[in-house]
């Protein structure tokens, strides 16, 4: 089981909130998050309540202040919800599709891909089916830019999920011991 502790000030000072599962509204416990300690497991933190907005992946470690987290690639300064990524030790497999509802060109993916356009000759893809494993998708090649967490399931339309202007350009398996 994972455990993440949110503090309302930098350097683990002030009030804290211990979390060992998903939390859709951290603001119920703290008015702001200034630092984070992940004692075990892996988590996605979200800019808005109910797992909405920009996302950032956290593994076990200490995150002393939001400014440091922003220098690591996090592009937002407010954390309102978090989701625990369950431990997983199996194979990784997904299918990506050029169009909504699993239409158009399809490719099966089983490993990390630092540049989807180069490897698969796809400038864009609009749906996917994650069969096995947990994945991070990135808006730029080489695992840069904003990221999104995808767990096993069918994702028929990125546009319907609120990603209408989004292009995923690289993807990585979450292989950490979460």
Swiss-Prot record:
Q: Which SMART domains match?
A: XTALbg
The processes (GO biological process) annotated in the record are: lens development in camera-type eye; visual perception
Molecular-function GO terms, alphabetical: structural constituent of eye lens
Keyword field contains Heme: no
Q: Which InterPro entries match?
A: Beta/Gamma-Crystallin, Beta/gamma_crystallin, G_crystallin-like
**Signal sequence segment:** none
Which pairs of positions does the record mark as disulfide bonds?
Answer: none
Which family is this protein grouped under? Belongs to the beta/gamma-crystallin family.
Domain remark text = Has a two-domain beta-structure, folded into four very similar Greek key motifs.
Question: What's this chain's function?
Answer: Crystallins are the dominant structural components of the vertebrate eye lens.
Please report the name of this protein according to its UniProt entry: Gamma-crystallin M1
- Per the UniProt record, the source organism is Cyprinus carpio (Common carp)
């Amino acid at each position: 089981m994972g455990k993440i502790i949110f503090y309302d000030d930098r350097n683990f000072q002030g009030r804290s909130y211990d979390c060992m599962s998903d939390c859709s509204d951290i603001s119920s416990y703290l008015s702001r998050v200034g630092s984070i300690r992940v004692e075990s497991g892996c988590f996605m933190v979200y800019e808005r309540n109910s797992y909405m907005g920009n996302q950032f992946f956290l593994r076990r470690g200490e995150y002393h202040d939001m400014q440091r987290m922003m220098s690591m690639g996090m592009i937002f300064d407010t954390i309102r919800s978090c989701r625990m990524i369950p431990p997983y030790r199996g194979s990784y497999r997904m299918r990506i599709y050029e169009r909504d509802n699993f239409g158009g060109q399809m490719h099966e993916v089983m490993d990390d891909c630092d540049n989807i356009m180069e490897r698969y000759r796809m400038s864009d893809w609009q749906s996917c089916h994650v069969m096995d494993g947990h994945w991070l998708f990135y808006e730029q090649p080489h695992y840069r830019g904003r990221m999104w967490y995808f767990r096993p399931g069918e994702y028929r339309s990125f546009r319907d999920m609120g990603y209408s202007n989004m292009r995923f350009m690289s993807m990585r398996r979450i292989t950490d011991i979460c």
